[in-house]
Regions:
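N-terminal targeting sequences that direct proteins away from the cytosol to non-cytosolic compartments
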Residues: 17-88, 105-107, 111-113, 117-118, ...
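Short hydrophobic beta-strand segments that form the core of ligand-binding sensory/regulatory domains
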Residues: 142, 166-170
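A short, structured loop/turn motif at beta-sheet edges
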Residues: 131-136, 157-163
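Sec-dependent bacterial lipoprotein signal peptides
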Residues: 1-19
């Protein structure tokens, strides 16, 4: 009887040591995102430009820009539009200004640069890409902002003489680069389609 009582704890000890439980930390998981099917339509409004944009996006006039209220220059721009992505919780803010002098043109270009590099605090890198479509007189710069910055994509388009349009993509959530990366890659393709199809009227 004493022998059985001795062997029971020993067997339990071996059983406890032999378990195959993995207690290593697991990477954080994120919700699965169901992306809408890619389909596009023409944007034609009472504006001096036109472009192609996704059917799952909503274009609206931005009469009280929430993200840009602090920037008085933006509020004074001729047109403020939002390309809303309701399913993806993001907005591409578009602002247009007519170029009336070289001084205004230089200021607009400098502002675009400053607004992009304002994100340097949280960004791990900022890349600039040249936009050039001479047949349509569409030129500009495309800023890719990596890391946990509030805006991951910014750009401006101009014909250098009469027109200037700036775009900035924001998501309505705390920026976590890993979690928004799939959505960002999806929306970036739409921004590329918009830029490649962009025309001045």
């Amino acid at each position: 009887m004493k022998r059985i009582i001795f062997f029971i704890p020993v067997l339990l000890l071996f059983a406890a040591c032999n378990s195959n439980h993995d207690y290593s930390p697991k990477p954080r998981g994120y919700f699965r995102i169901v992306f809408p099917e890619k389909a596009y339509q023409q944007f034609n409004g009472p504006y001096p430009f036109t472009f192609i944009y996704p059917k799952y996006a909503v274009m609206e006039k931005d009469s009280a820009p929430s993200l840009q209220k602090k920037d008085k220059k933006l509020l004074n721009m001729k047109y403020l539009l939002n390309m809303q992505f309701p399913q993806l919780n993001g907005t591409l803010h578009l602002s247009y200004e007519a170029i009336t002098s070289k001084k205004i043109f230089d200021e607009l270009i400098e502002d675009a640069h400053k607004l992009a590099f304002k994100h340097t605090v949280k960004a791990t890198g900022i890349d600039e890409g040249i936009i050039s479509y001479p047949d349509r007189k569409v030129y500009g710069l495309y800023y890719t902002i990596d890391g946990n910055a509030a805006s991951a994509v910014q750009f401006y388009l101009t014909d250098s003489l009469h027109h200037y349009l700036r775009g900035a993509l924001y998501f309505n959530s705390i920026p976590q680069f890993d979690s928004i990366q799939p959505v960002l890659n999806f929306v970036k393709k739409d921004v590329d389609v918009m830029i490649k199809s962009f025309k001045w009227k």
